[in-house]
Amino acid sequence: MSKQLLALNIDGALLRSNGKIHQATKDAIEYVKKKGIYVTLVTNRHFRSAQKIAKSLKLDAKLITHSGAYIAEKIDAPFFEKRISDDHTFNIVQVLESYQCNIRLLHEKYSIGNKKKVNSNLLGKALIHPSDPIFYPVQFVESLSDLLMDEPVSAPVIEVYTEHDIQHDITETITKAFPAVDVIRVNDEKLNIVPKGVSKEAGLALVASELGLSMDDVVAIGHQYDDLPMIELAGLGVAMGNAVPEIKRKADWVTRSNDEQGVAYMMKEYFRMQQRKGFLDKFHMKRV
């Protein structure tokens, strides 16, 4: 069965370890676009960051950003958005400030984080986002809750950078205290707190539906824990060679790693036999 929508994770899939996209990957994306495949990005990143990458790939698509909480082609005209209320954002931050963690409120137009002292590796991941565009303000403050008292924020996503051994405690505490949100494990050092029902897979299903497609028509490529549900739901779920073992076990296809152009390899191998939809319709042929 042919696929008509290709959903790509950014970090660990599109991007190599050096943070760059290989020319082979760009060429492969252009190749599948010429076959009539709708290509989009599915990411935890904020919209501005995903938009910058989409532009470099010449993608005109609804981008699934903020873990599925913000879907748009243009920042001021979202197709879908869902936020944590400013009251809940404030209260959740108060709870998180009792833990040894870095907090980042990821709005589509700016981000605000705290300066909590954690190990240098975690701090670097919370502070350094090399793809943040210059027009995306990033602010760090001593007390996030103090700032929110004066300047309320309704955040699509609250990022939490912390040690793996306290992730479960944070997840349990937030889930019990705030039923209006979900806590998603991204990797061993990061949790995302999102509005209830928000996820990458839910966002991808929305975009597919808007295109008149089902999840059976989708190829989804990812590598970390929060990619697993969309990989399982997609018609073809693909794990990167650098993916966590659980995703590799459950994927339909394991491609090469991000440093071995795994995305480009998979696209060329899978889509090379698939004809453009309009070509097949012209001759009343079934796609294979």
Curated annotation (Swiss-Prot):
<dbReference type="Pfam" id="PF08282">
    <property type="entry name" value="Hydrolase_3"/>
</dbReference>
<dbReference type="InterPro" id="IPR023214">
    <property type="entry name" value="HAD_sf"/>
</dbReference>
<dbReference type="GO" id="GO:0000287">
    <property type="term" value="F:magnesium ion binding"/>
</dbReference>
<protein>
    <recommendedName>
        <fullName>Stress response protein YhaX</fullName>
    </recommendedName>
</protein>
<dbReference type="InterPro" id="IPR000150">
    <property type="entry name" value="Cof"/>
</dbReference>
<dbReference type="GO" id="GO:0005829">
    <property type="term" value="C:cytosol"/>
</dbReference>
<keyword id="KW-0346">Stress response</keyword>
<dbReference type="GO" id="GO:0016791">
    <property type="term" value="F:phosphatase activity"/>
</dbReference>
<dbReference type="InterPro" id="IPR036412">
    <property type="entry name" value="HAD-like_sf"/>
</dbReference>
<dbReference type="InterPro" id="IPR006379">
    <property type="entry name" value="HAD-SF_hydro_IIB"/>
</dbReference>
